[in-house]
Amino acid sequence: MKLKLYLIPLLASGIILSACSSTTSQVISSLSSAQKYFEANKGELNKNNVINILKDGYNSDPNKTVNALLAGWKYTLMDQKLLENNLDPSRFKNTFGPNKNKDDVTPNISEKGLFLNETFTGLGSQIAEVFNVQKQIVSGFSYSWTSPKSFKVNIHIKMEGMINEKSKETIKSFLSNKDSNGSNSVEESEYTGDKAKFTADFIFSYTPPTGGTRSLTDKSFDVITNMINFPADVKIDVNTSHNKLNELLEKNDQVKRMKSRTFNGRNIDLLPFFYYALL
């Protein structure tokens, strides 16, 4: 009955409003409270209802609502280890969609997740090959929110990579290129044995959007598209433990652009992460 009342388009009764406010306050008070609520009311757990409840919550208490959303993002990445563990296909499909994969998780270290084709037109796949990601771990996730104009989210992903024949040739090619400012060191010893293994640190920072992008509003909670768009500028910083990769990041005119990049006015869909935390 509570779900039916909530989905009535025109709320004419003060009793109905009271019931909805009670549901909303439980869901937005904390992620654990939302999990307990939907565990006890499984019939109400669907994307449209979750979006409507969160939209109502944003209009009544935006700080609690956004903090609950960010907690869901953190929980799904760090506690559920979405990037590290093998995917539960059914759960992932229910949250992210039938045609999505790990490359669609935000953030992640991949050609798509790093926006490589936007920085390196026609070279995105080659840059991704250089890193040859074997494993990535979300090792840090911090956030603070005051308003759509004042917030910051920092996500630290540690990556383990391995130089293989393909990535070795790509690195050599970049190092031999004139854009590397005369650096053409391609000694085999730099790419074999333990030296073929390396780590990298990627820091993803999310701050209020610039460039004319609209900030978060109640219209960001969209039941038509089944999305909760969180507008932000995204900054990506990277460093690695591999001498030759660092050489590229420091000296190669193309690759060094990857060391620190900013993308203005991006929309991060937070619904899949919050919804994943509820299943």
Swiss-Prot record:
Name assigned to this protein: Uncharacterized lipoprotein MG439 homolog 4
Superkingdom in the source lineage: Bacteria
Disulfide bond positions: none
Subcellular location per the Swiss-Prot or TrEMBL entry: Cell membrane
Species assigned in the record: Mycoplasma pneumoniae (strain ATCC 29342 / M129 / Subtype 1) (Mycoplasmoides pneumoniae)
Membrane topology listed for this record: Lipid-anchor
Family statement drawn from the similarity comment of this UniProt entry: Belongs to the MG439/MG440 family.
Record's keyword terms, sorted: Cell membrane, Lipoprotein, Membrane, Palmitate, Signal
Family annotation (InterPro entries): Lipoprotein_3
Residues carrying lipid (N-palmitoyl cysteine): 20
Residues covalently joined to lipid (S-diacylglycerol cysteine): 20
Signal peptide: 1-19
Stretches that traverse the bilayer: none
Cellular component GO terms, alphabetical: plasma membrane
UniProt lineage: Bacteria, Bacillati, Mycoplasmatota, Mycoplasmoidales, Mycoplasmoidaceae
